[in-house]
Curated annotation (Swiss-Prot):
GO biological processes: central nervous system development; cytoskeleton organization; galactosylceramide biosynthetic process; glycosphingolipid biosynthetic process; neuron projection morphogenesis; paranodal junction assembly; peripheral nervous system development; protein localization to paranode region of axon
Glycosylation sites: 78, 333, 442
Swiss-Prot/TrEMBL catalytic activity: an N-acylsphing-4-enine + UDP-alpha-D-galactose = a beta-D-galactosyl-(1<->1')-N-acylsphing-4-enine + UDP + H(+); an N-acyl-sphingoid base + UDP-alpha-D-galactose = a D-galactosylceramide + UDP + H(+); N-(2-hydroxy-hexanoyl)-sphing-4-enine + UDP-alpha-D-galactose = N-(2-hydroxy-hexanoyl)-beta-D-galactosyl-sphing-4-enine + UDP + H(+); N-(2-hydroxy-hexanoyl)-sphinganine + UDP-alpha-D-galactose = N-(2-hydroxyhexanoyl)-beta-D-galactosylsphinganine + UDP + H(+)
Species of origin: Homo sapiens
Protein name: 2-hydroxyacylsphingosine 1-beta-galactosyltransferase
Keywords: Endoplasmic reticulum, Glycoprotein, Glycosyltransferase, Lipid metabolism, Membrane, Signal, Sphingolipid metabolism, Transferase, Transmembrane, Transmembrane helix
Membrane-protein topology: Single-pass membrane protein
Signal peptide feature range: 1-20
Source species taxonomy: Eukaryota, Metazoa, Chordata, Craniata, Vertebrata
EC number: 2.4.1.47
Length: 541
């Protein structure tokens, strides 16, 4: 019998080639944790037959791979200088400088780098010739929107942070949807709702008058046509892929073109390296505690490091701590310092009891995946929002690095280790996170394929961006109702006054026509006596 298998294979290959797309990704110019996610996506896209290009500055370190290619440009940073810049920001924050000031300084560097990209004529012309099918924007660095507009290519947002911006257009009732950086939950009292409203208004003003205008000035400088505002570009995104999850995020209204894909880096634990396996095997029934503040935070202040070392040294558990810098003087004998560690594999080990973290999103999703309780000390950015949700969900405790004491840290660690409710909640959230159609990577690739297949998937976009502020909040209807009420009031007032005048006029006439209850036959007063008899008039001679 003739086999048709080769023909089916050939047909399938042809279909795959037909659907293959060229995708360009514009990652932020710093924060290597974001690149971990994008490299994972690039590998998955490669398996689907797509070709991915990273737009990176010269000198930025990235391992070569057959899964993606690189388009370099002369930017303001290379890997060494960007890391040094980020560590300087951390030192400034630890020394007491306002976090907001440091974040705005980062924004200034984002826009300076964006100016270099947009003004690089050779770079832009080369990218235009590539005829990309899709551009992925990380909204942490909003230059991606400008590049997409410049290239005239469809684009989608992939947010690597815990961020659900109001600019998406989804309803956000402030009574139960906490604003980013508010440190609130979906259960708010009166004062908290007032705070949430204030943070929302400040955020919208900051975005409208401080953030977006910086990029608009770049577009005006290089006369980008057709003229569009940054709001138009943000609203023009085909899809919003957000790194959050139903296990972590508070329930809230959303839109069809918004999908949750948090947990891109989650995976089962692999066997530990031999030296670490021996160390873990040496842990008694108390197990071990993992400590890591992420790849982006290489140096803690001496004060914080000493507090951590003191609290960790009092635990009966063994401690493995990802740490760089001078060794704390009060380091306990139970604590092992190491500059790099396989975090996911340690989190998945059966002997782990707790995780002490800064609340970075990638770390928290790995923690949720493996069902491990957390003590979080957020430092900046979305760390606070992430740990607020972890604490509200019952799988961890949030501590403030500026005020926490060694005793408070020790007590928090003991609590999450010895109170079984924290591990039970962590394991339940792990079940919820995993009980979804496919791994987050597969869901992300599906949606990228979807918007490519449907040429931007405009049918998913709500009309919210085509209506004005007055229409959205029904202010025009309120105006019509108020105007109608005012007209009705004046009409009723006029009718009432008219009727009143008529009644008053009739009453006045009747009053003048009657004296002591007797009618005067229509003759004016004075022609009759008061007793009702006729009064004779004297003739005038």
């Amino acid at each position: 019998m003739k086999s048709y298998t080769p023909y089916f294979i050939l047909l399938w290959s042809a279909v795959g080639i037909a659907k293959a797309a060229k995708i360009i990704i514009v990652p932020p110019i710093m924060f290597e944790s974001h690149m971990y996610i994008f490299k994972t996506l690039a590998s998955a896209l490669h398996e689907r037959g797509h070709h991915t290009v990273f737009l990176l500055s010269e000198g930025r370190d990235i391992a070569p791979s057959n899964h993606y290619s690189l388009q370099r440009y002369p930017g303001i940073f290379n890997s060494t200088t960007s890391d040094a810049f980020l560590q300087s920001k951390m030192r400034n924050i630890f020394s007491g400088r306002l976090t907001a000031i440091e974040l705005f300084d980062i924004l200034d560097h984002y826009t300076k780098n964006c100016d270099l990209m947009v003004g690089n004529h050779a770079l832009i012309q080369g990218l235009k010739k590539e005829k990309f099918d899709l551009l992925l924007v990380d909204p942490n660095d909003m230059c991606g929107f400008v590049i997409a507009h410049l290239l005239g290519v469809k684009y989608a947002v992939f947010s690597t942070g815990l961020w659900y911006p109001a600019e998406v257009g989804a309803p956000a009732p402030l009574a139960y949807v906490p604003e980013f950086n508010s440190l609130l939950t979906d259960r708010m009292n009166l004062l908290q709702r007032m705070k949430n409203t204030g943070v929302y208004l400040i955020s919208r003003l900051g975005v409208s008058f401080l953030v977006l205008p910086k990029y608009e000035r770049i577009m005006q400088k290089y006369n980008l046509l057709p003229e569009k505002s940054m709001y138009d570009l943000v609203h023009g995104s085909s899809l919003w892929m957000l790194c959050t999850d139903v296990a972590l995020e508070f329930p809230r209204p959303t839109l069809p073109n918004v999908v949750y894909v948090g947990g891109i880096l989650t995976k089962p634990a692999s066997p530990l390296p031999e030296d670490l396996q021996r160390w873990v095997n040496g842990a008694n029934e108390h197990g071990f505690v993992l400590v890591s503040f992420g790849a982006g935070v290489k140096y803690l202040s001496e004060d914080i490091a000493n507090k951590l070392a003191g609290a960790l040294g009092r635990l009966p558990q063994k401690v493995i701590w990802r740490f760089s810098g001078p060794k704390p003087k009060n380091l306990g004998n139970n604590t092992k310092l190491i500059e790099w560690l396989p975090q996911n594999d340690l989190l998945g080990h059966s002997k782990i009891k707790a995780f002490l973290s800064h609340g970075g999103l990638n770390s928290i999703f790995e923690t949720i995946y493996h069902g491990v309780p957390v003590v979080g000390i957020p430092l900046f950015g979305d760390h606070y929002d992430t740990m607020t949700r972890v604490q509200a969900k019952g799988m961890g405790i949030l501590l403030e690095w500026k005020t926490v004491t060694e005793k408070e840290l020790y007590e928090a660690l003991v609590k999450v280790i010895n109170n079984p409710s924290y591990r039970q909640r962590a394991q339940k959230l792990s079940e919820i996170h995993k009980d979804q159609p496919g791994h987050p990577v597969n869901r992300t690739i599906y949606w990228i394929d979807y918007i490519i297949r449907h040429n931007g998937a405009h049918h998913l976009r709500a009309a919210v961006h085509q209506i004005s502020f007055c229409q959205y909040f029904l202010l025009d209807i309120a105006f019509v109702l108020l105007l109608g009420a005012a007209l009705l009031y004046f009409l009723l007032s006029w009718v009432t006054k008219f009727i009143y005048r008529k009644i008053k006029s009739l009453w006045s006439r009747n009053k003048h026509s009657t004296v002591n209850g007797h009618y005067h036959n229509g003759i004016l007063n004075g022609k009759y006596k008061r007793n009702g008899h006729i009064k004779h008039e004297k003739k005038v001679k």
